[in-house]
Amino acid sequence: KKDFPMKKSLFLLMLTASLSAYATNHEIKMLDNGKDGSMVFEPGYVNAKVGDTVTFKAANSGHWVQSKALPEGVADFLSEDGKDFTLKLDKEGVYVYTCPPHRMMNMSGVIQVGKPVNKAKAQAVVDEMENRAMQSKGRLKKYMAQVK
């Protein structure tokens, strides 16, 4: 019975590895031009699961990503100019983000993780961002409308 702790450790290691094998990394490109127009995140809406990650890919320079609305308990984030940035999605809810230098061009997006527990707060932020947008009005609302 001396090898029981070893078997238990091995079992827990295998269980952890199998659970992490189901996590997905979603890639979002920061682009000058994309399917939804100029200055855009592609895709602009991602539906993910708790435990997944999102990697914002700096396909063009001059872009970075900043959080605007997050589920309770998630720390604000701000990436560096022209650098890829990976975010672990640990909490259910709606994540709204933008590219600060192109916010007026409505370069923003939405990630839904599980249930949209903070949908009302996220919607209020989206409405405010849409009101301030000078270009591509309606694009962020279109992404938010996919949150179910």
What are these regions (language model features)?
Residues 1-5:
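Short, Lys/Arg-enriched N-terminal segments with co-localized hydrophobic residues
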Residues 22-148:
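Extracytoplasmic copper-binding redox domains, predominantly the cupredoxin/blue-copper superfamily
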Residues 7-13:
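Sec-dependent signal peptide recognition
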Residues 13-14, 144:
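Short, low-complexity polar/charged micro-motifs in intrinsically disordered terminal tails
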